[in-house]
Amino acid sequence: MSKSGNGNGDKVLYCSFCGKSQHEVKKLIAGPSVFVCDECVELCNDIIREETHETHEETEARLPTPKEISNFLDEYVIGQQHAKKVLSVAVYNHYKRLQHKSEDGVELGKSNILLIGPTGSGKTLLAQTLARILNVPFAMADATTLTEAGYVGEDVENIIQKLLQKCDYDVDKAQQGIVYIDEIDKISRKSDNPSITRDVSGEGVQQALLKLIEGTVASVPPQGGRKHPQQEFLQVDTSNILFICGGAFAGLDKVIRERSDKSSIGFSAQLKSKKSSNDEASKVLGQLESDDLIKYGLIPEFVGRLPVVTTLQELDEAALIDILTRPKNALTKQFQSLFKMEGSELEFRDEALIAIAKKALERKMGARGLRSILENILLDTMYDLPSLEGVNKIVIDESVVNGLSKPILIYEQDEKKSASGSKD
């Protein structure tokens, strides 16, 4: 749209949408027989952004089913099928409880989770992967660093601060997050009898965690912490935060055996004891009861706040080999991607994978030991490779894993020679 101006042949242009002249706006963009001003462009952008945000929120609101959660866990975590099933159902019920507030007056309790399993069995990875599929903030804490308020160490409220940091201090998001507390077995009290002296890193921490896990309004310093004391503390309601606690609980199988042995008396008790002593620890853990955890050193109130308990099996050689190769972000795939950036292909032979798994089993580190083994094997190659030219492939075999030889480097000219030789 245009209009004659001052009679000198100048034309005043107008926005085809809002009708404002070129003098009333900052910018007028021309199209085929139409004009649009910068204000209308900004308005259109706002409308599109708002609609996109609403669509995104609708997508996020859809809660995956337990089977979908378990299938997603399968992509990243090898084995532990029973633990995956228990976690999938518990997490689904927890977030379903948040989405559908009870209309019949029945209050649904929160089902926090306790994961029991040896080091490197996948406890932390399961919790991290759950947070990823649900697209909620996730924070990790180490129970061994926690102390009662007023003592040297981390207060339990610091856990909530970590969760807030993960979501840019959005309180609403944090209140629906997941917190994983590792090494929870390390805060077991030192004896069955309540101690007269303060146990600030054991029973004291359990007492401090009680309300936080059950649900309370925690006061957390805002962004910047104590540097700005005049700022008001953020109030975070923890009643909808899902707490997952994990620990190795070394020796718990002995506690279970002792209880089961006492269930019989006389000659039959001795027979049962002999039989149970030959059982694998993982099978014994399947008979776990709440009293066993209390006997181990967790206070009854704390055990009561963790109603969902599941055990993870110790990983065998086959599972460790699968962990090296099968998941989306498998360790071998990560290193292959790293070497690809240098223009080289990294190949692990089957016997090398078996040798790596055996080393991890010897170290009793489970899946956690795999990365350090691979780092040691590939250290020299990663050091030299950026300085070398024409290396097409690096091959890792059993002798390399056992330190008897160096990785096999295949150069570009070697491949060309072998290719021409095969033609002849």
Curated annotation (Swiss-Prot):
Naming one, the record's GO cellular component terms include: HslUV protease complex
Gene3D superfamilies xref list: 1.10.8.60, ClpX chaperone, C4-type zinc finger domain, P-loop containing nucleotide triphosphate hydrolases
Regions crossing the membrane: none
**SMART domains in the record:** AAA, ClpB_D2-small, zf-C4_ClpX
Q: Per UniProt, what is one GO molecular function of this protein? A: protein dimerization activity
In this chain the ClpX-type ZB domain maps to 1-56
A Gene Ontology biological process annotation? Answer: cell division
Which positions bind Zn(2+)? 15, 18, 37, 40
NCBIfam families given in the database record: clpX (TIGR00382), PRK05342.1 (NF003745)
Self-association or partners: how does it assemble?
Component of the ClpX-ClpP complex. Forms a hexameric ring that, in the presence of ATP, binds to fourteen ClpP subunits assembled into a disk-like structure with a central cavity, resembling the structure of eukaryotic proteasomes.
Task of the protein: ATP-dependent specificity component of the Clp protease. It directs the protease to specific substrates. Can perform chaperone functions in the absence of ClpP.
The similarity comment for this entry is:
Belongs to the ClpX chaperone family.
What is the name attached to this protein's record? ATP-dependent Clp protease ATP-binding subunit ClpX
Q: Which organism is it from?
A: Legionella pneumophila (strain Paris)
